[in-house]
Amino acid sequence: MPQYRSRTSTHGRNMAGARALWRATGMKEDDFQKPIIAIANSFTQFVPGHVHLKDLGQLVAREIERAGGVAKEFNTIAVDDGIAMGHSGMLYSLPSRDLIADAVEYMVSAHCADALVCISNCDKITPGMLMAALRLNIPVVFVSGGPMEAGKVNWQGNMHKLDLVDAMVAAADSNVSDAESEAIERSACPTCGSCSGMFTANSMNCLTEALGLSLPGNGSTLATHAARKELFLKAGRLIVEITKRYYEQDDESVLPRSIANFKAFENAMSLDVAMGGSTNTVLHLLAAAHEAEVDFTMADIDRISRGVPCICKVAPATAKYHMEDVHRAGGVMAILSELSRAGLIHRDTPTVHSPTLGEALDKWDIMTTNDEDVKKFYRAAPGGISTTIAFSQSMLWPDLDTDRKEGCIRDKDHAYSQDGGLAVLYGNIALDGCIVKTAGVDDSILKFTGRARIFESQDDAVAAILADKIEAGDIVIIRYEGPRGGPGMQEMLYPTSYLKSKGLGKACALLTDGRFSGGTSGLSIGHASPEAAEGGAIGLVEENDIIEIDIPNRTIHLAVKDEVLAHRRAAMEARGKDAWKPVNRQRHISVALRAYAAMSTSAAKGAVRDVSQIEK
């Protein structure tokens, strides 16, 4: 029988000093016999996805106490990728994931907490906390802040839905008036919550459902809706229940590594492919699997992407549907149920809330359930009022979206495409693979051949696009932006948004060893591995080289003879200490970022740390 970790600091005469300090935090005598549950909150006023989380940790804490536990809350940092986008701030986004994981590990381990509730929401916070939870392997429940309502603007009597990307594209489009651009800007992000499309934050919160570590509805229930409050209350009760099952009944099935096993990672990736999730999820799932000691690799992602159809299409892949529409159609449980009917997921994986995922689907699938509470839960609708307050409205859709032929979520026979929403491409320019969000690629450019335009920083590429130096048929190459070369593996939302604003969204491609925002659409290929800074062939591409992209056949090819590439590689190596470094790039790299670069690995491995690179 495992011993409560907390008793290291709460039991025994030699721990009198520690108990004195615990008492100073408000603990009473009988509290020393209870499990201590850490609450990792990520409230910050910098991020709309987190601005409403301030009191939610204490909401969970009171529920933990009522269930018989002791709750202790702490905070992590949270970077807003949208605000950090397009300048040097983006260098810090991906590194913050590891910092968050470490912070959670430090707090939980230093204070010997028995279990953990993770209150996350946005891009790097959910992955960072997920990595920490799998590293610690103590009972955990995830509950996120929830999606933002979609923006809405009335143009000439017609209502249009908006999101953050619309504001970026409109601002760079010379055909959009200042008044129109300002109207879009003011309407694009109307409430608290993670950005309203299937961007990275919402993708990751959906994946925690598929992994079995969060409650049904976690990925899709709006931040503003009263129905989301119950998820926080349930999380408080549930964490005490599973904590006691582990420590008092020796039930290891509730531990995160027992739940997030290889099959669960396959389920999560199948969901990701089916809903056309952010390409960043590939990076984060690989990193999470590494922490869980699960042998889940790019080869598995490639295999799954070839066999799972795209049955849900959401912004930025379409302007018609946002997360509020996914919820109305049954949320993550509905997507997984359609995959289950197609025999494409494992129903026998455990979850924190149900013995198996299959049993959870039987209850929460709106197409088959007789539970009226479940049906009402998925009718939770946007309130249409600008607010930063959680649970502030209780609007309901008049009905559910159960149209599996032409609705937001479809069955396999009526899929948006029988090919999945994400794909791994291989070729001489990316021997270890690269990633494209096929759900956002127009059918007309699934096969594309173009000439390379070389940029060794995102800033230079943006300047060229805005100066109309990029033409139809060009493939914009942005290199030395990988985990080590950036460092920090910047997102490329501005270049792709500006290509769209210039009318080149279906006429150009972009290839980078950096990554893309979940808000990116178009023929945008990221994570090229090995990256240029590690000697990857993307560092050998020259201006006007021809590159052939074939998504249906999962290939990307630099049309340069092997002997020419070998000559270029030799010339690069001859540069000595300047080899595999950008030419004439002016960029300040802080000590913190240099430390990150020294330990980081390839995107093909999730950009996880490998301390052996600096150990002597």
Swiss-Prot record:
Functions in the biosynthesis of branched-chain amino acids. Catalyzes the dehydration of (2R,3R)-2,3-dihydroxy-3-methylpentanoate (2,3-dihydroxy-3-methylvalerate) into 2-oxo-3-methylpentanoate (2-oxo-3-methylvalerate) and of (2R)-2,3-dihydroxy-3-methylbutanoate (2,3-dihydroxyisovalerate) into 2-oxo-3-methylbutanoate (2-oxoisovalerate), the penultimate precursor to L-isoleucine and L-valine, respectively. InterPro entries: Dihydro-acid_dehy_C, DihydroxyA_deHydtase, DiOHA_6PGluconate_deHydtase_CS, ILV_EDD_C, ILV_EDD_N, IlvD/EDD_N. PANTHER family: D-XYLONATE DEHYDRATASE (PTHR43661), D-XYLONATE DEHYDRATASE YAGF-RELATED (PTHR43661:SF3). It is an enzyme of class 4 (lyase). Mg(2+) binds at residues 81, 123-124, 491. Its EC number is 4.2.1.9. Belongs to the IlvD/Edd family. GO terms for molecular function: 2 iron, 2 sulfur cluster binding; dihydroxy-acid dehydratase activity; magnesium ion binding. It catalyses: (2R)-2,3-dihydroxy-3-methylbutanoate = 3-methyl-2-oxobutanoate + H2O; (2R,3R)-2,3-dihydroxy-3-methylpentanoate = (S)-3-methyl-2-oxopentanoate + H2O. This is Dihydroxy-acid dehydratase. Gene3D superfamilies: IlvD/EDD C-terminal domain-like. The active site is at residue 517. The keyword Magnesium applies. It comes from the Bacteria. Homodimer. Keywords: 2Fe-2S, Amino-acid biosynthesis, Branched-chain amino acid biosynthesis, Iron, Iron-sulfur, Lyase, Magnesium, Metal-binding. One of its GO terms (biological process) is isoleucine biosynthetic process. The lineage of its organism: Bacteria, Pseudomonadati, Pseudomonadota, Betaproteobacteria, Nitrosomonadales. [2Fe-2S] cluster binds at residues 122, 195. Pathway: Amino-acid biosynthesis; L-isoleucine biosynthesis; L-isoleucine from 2-oxobutanoate: step 3/4; Amino-acid biosynthesis; L-valine biosynthesis; L-valine from pyruvate: step 3/4. Binds 1 [2Fe-2S] cluster per subunit. This cluster acts as a Lewis acid cofactor. GO terms for cellular component: cytosol. Its cofactor is [2Fe-2S] cluster; Mg(2+). The modification N6-carboxylysine is found at residue 124.
